[in-house]
Amino acid sequence: PIDGLLRKMVHVPGRLFSVAQWTVRNIPRLFARNERLICLFSTDAGPIVMVLVGAINVAAIETVWSGLVTPPRGKRITDFDYADTKKTYQKGEEMGRFNMGSTVILLTPPNVEWLSKFRAGQVVRVGEAIGSFTKKKNVL
């Protein structure tokens, strides 16, 4: 959503509950229980965290920098340090994909003004604007 430098990636194994609205409402802490790939970036607007959440029917999570990310044996959390690799990505550039589709959670600094047209659970397409930073006018 913004130009950034990849600092770290953490794979957290977990369940693969559906991320359909009914399931999200009825399974406590679903997004914290499902498999996740947490990607930390440094940006001009501050740190950005992109969390790719696995789900049922998601064949795999894949990133452009590491390829297919598969759960390790023993369900251990796997930490990947990219601090010294200078892996930079431009706004709008592909970061990763679900090989069936799922959910992305984006954590940003507090200086984001979200577009009012978006509602919880709404589908967002690649390249679609979702907001802007209030101090520096970068469109997310």
Mark where each language-model region is.
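Contiguous, well-folded functional domains in the mature portion of proteins
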Residues: 1-140
